[in-house]
Amino acid sequence: KEKKLNLSENFKTFVDKIKVKNEEEENEAKVGNSIVTTLDLELQQVASDALGDNKGSVVAINPKTGEILAMVSKPSFDPNDLGAALEAAYSGSDEETPLINRAIDGLYPPGSVFKTVTLSSALENIPGVANRTFNDQGKIIFDDGTTLNNYAYQSHGAIDLRYAYRVSSNVVFGTLAMELGNSTLKQTAENYGFNSVISGPGLTITASQ
């Protein structure tokens, strides 16, 4: 019985040594393929510094080649401690959601950038709009009772379309949007590529929602 016990222990030790050896061989570092990115380190740093501690993303693309020159998403995480970020994400303890790449996964309203679409639609569909004077009292009330204020609750008084665009008047462009109606404004937006997948070299932009 004693000999059988020793044999069993020796066999177990032998198997354990083989297992450890195999694991060491599997974990040995191997030379991989070289990866060359199009990122500009200096531009990447500038984008990261500009974004600071704010949530959001910054992307710089070469329009001729589609090369991604900079892509920053914040909040970010330490790539050397990915395990901690994954654990926090799975447990739901990190409300900052740093694993979401906001440059490609975020869904955001266009904001005042859309005023350019509204302006284009108004010039095309509202006769004489370029010569009108608008009374900007600082806020506008929509048909459903929703109130939209200007930035910092500013009132601009009697202004023309050019000035309204320069100061990004929510009152004037909200008024124009109501005059145009949903279908007309939607058609203009789609003429500019909204609701369409914009594919090309580098970063593909999915359809708006």
Regions found by a protein language model. Name each.
Residues 22-24, 64-112, 117-209:
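Beta-lactam-recognizing serine transpeptidase/beta-lactamase-like catalytic domain environment
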Residues 1-57, 72, 77-102, 107:
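Extracytoplasmic/periplasmic proteins that interact with beta-lactams or build/remodel peptidoglycan
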Residues 58-63:
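Short hydrophobic alpha-helical segments used for membrane anchoring or interfacial signaling
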